[in-house]
């Protein structure tokens, strides 16, 4: 967790990470904000950062990284802080890569990752910026690797962390009123996914079977 202290002590780096990777680091560890409804989490944890929507990143008891979303989704997202930061440097956020069906077919995931990279480069170019240069500079400050061609590999690592056991889950309520929080992986195929792979929802579903 060496990067944690470095980031906490560097205000400019924290601002850059929020702007580029949608992660705002807290000054210190804190209890998660989503603990007011008698939630029972499967693993002990402590919050160290949040995203723009209010979801929180937590360090789990095995030192892997979990995420508790503002819309009720819960799960593991990385095996270490370095892995999380490396993924975010390439992906920008975890939500864009949360569609479970993408990981059922390597060709489909490859198409999505290439489409994502092309689109994000276009977006930066429209602002007069070079995505590769911006992210490579941030990676250098963090002492981490930035290789866009490895996005598919990094996405698979994210997926594998999310599905491995013991899973990071949450439930609340009692008996018939007990509710289990959604996984961070979703079966929803958004327009974003369809646009990037150039396929309809039905085509994606057939492709992933």
Model-identified regions with their sequence ranges:
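A surface-exposed partner-binding patch
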Residues: 1-72, 99-104, 116-209
């Amino acid at each position: 967790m060496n990067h944690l202290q470095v980031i906490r002590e560097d205000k400019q780096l924290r601002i850059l990470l929020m702007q580029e990777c949608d992660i705002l680091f807290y000054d210190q560890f804190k209890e998660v904000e989503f603990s007011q409804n008698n939630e029972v989490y499967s693993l002990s944890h402590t919050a160290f950062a949040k995203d723009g929507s209010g979801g929180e990143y937590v360090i789990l008891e095995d030192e892997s990284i979990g995420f508790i979303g503002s819309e009720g989704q819960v799960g593991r997202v990385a095996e270490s802080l370095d892995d999380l930061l490396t993924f975010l440097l390439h992906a920008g956020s975890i939500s864009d890569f949360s569609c479970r069906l993408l990981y059922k077919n390597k060709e489909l995931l490859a198409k999505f990752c290439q489409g994502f990279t092309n689109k994000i480069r276009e977006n930066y170019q429209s602002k007069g910026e070079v995505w590769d240069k911006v992210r490579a500079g941030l990676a250098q400050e963090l002492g981490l690797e930035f290789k866009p061609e490895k996005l598919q590999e990094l996405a698979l690592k994210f997926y594998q962390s999310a599905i491995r056991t013991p899973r990071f889950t949450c439930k609340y309520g009692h008996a018939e009123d007990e509710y289990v929080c959604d996984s961070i992986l979703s079966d929803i195929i958004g327009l974003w996914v369809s646009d990037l792979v150039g396929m309809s929802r039905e085509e994606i579903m057939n492709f992933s079977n």
